[in-house]
Regions:
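Intrinsic disorder/low-complexity segments in short proteins, especially the signal peptide
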Residues: 6, 23-25, 29-30
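Bacterial N-terminal signal peptides
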Residues: 15-23
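A structural boundary/capping signal
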Residues: 28-230
Length: 230
């Protein structure tokens, strides 16, 4: 009888620990409270104007597209931001040479440059359940324009040819069909990669990217939860 009671006590403690673990894990993937985010954004940036409609449309997309296949989610998100935003240089939009805007800032402006498109698509797909290891924000050289450029790449598996989500074109194509892009480095919430690194090995973490860290801080100020890995 004593052994039976000891067993039940252990199982109760195990169950409590499991429940607490699930609660903590749920906290790490907390819901995005768009009412609070809009209030915070207005306090930080002033009246949202037409940006509120774009933010509402983004919220609707995130709430309704999770049932799609991953490739379908790529297409929906890619088309959404390519249509909701117009291209504008940082110096004209933010009076800075290189500024990484949050998705909220980009939607308020209805504009951004290449990294702003890639960043907004990355966070959207992460929110829609695409694992971070399948997504990389990739810095490339656009050979036709002879300039730096940034895109989002998607790997269906670690050895797959990535698909490229680009602000320059709506079509999502394999990297093998984008000879106009020369990759330089890539990153996500978990690491940093250099083009040509053997075995796709990470060469560091995103703590080395000060603009990425600043971006996460801005998103937290806007009301997004502080998640350990985006």
């Amino acid at each position: 009888l004593a052994k039976r009671w000891a067993f039940h006590l252990i199982m109760r403690r195990f169950g409590l620990a499991l429940l607490l673990g699930c609660m903590l894990l749920g906290g790490l993937r907390a819901d995005w409270d768009f009412s609070q985010i809009s209030r915070r954004a207005q306090a930080l940036y002033g009246p949202l104007g037409a940006g509120q409609g774009r933010i509402d449309a983004w919220q609707q997309l995130l709430a309704t597209q999770k049932q799609l296949s991953e490739v379908e989610r790529l297409n929906v998100v890619n088309q959404f931001f390519n249509r909701q935003m117009r291209y504008e240089e940082d110096i004209d939009l933010w009076r800075e040479v290189d500024y990484w805007a949050t998705p909220i800032q980009s939607l308020i402006k209805g504009a951004g440059d290449c990294e702003d498109y890639a960043i907004a698509k990355y966070f959207s797909l992460r929110r829609l359940g695409v694992p971070s290891e399948k997504l990389r924000i990739t810095y490339v050289k656009a050979l036709r324009q002879n300039r730096a450029h940034m895109v989002l790449t998607y790997y269906s598996n670690p050895d797959a040819m990535p698909l490229v989500l680009d602000s320059l074109i709506d079509a999502i194509k394999p990297a093998s069909q984008r000879a106009d892009l020369l990759p330089v480095y890539a990153f996500n919430g978990e690491g940093l990669w250099l083009a040509g690194a053997k075995g796709n090995k990470k060469v560091g973490d995103t703590k080395r990217l000060s603009r990425w860290q600043d971006l996460l801080k801005k998103m937290q100020a806007e009301g997004f939860p502080a998640e350990p890995v985006y």
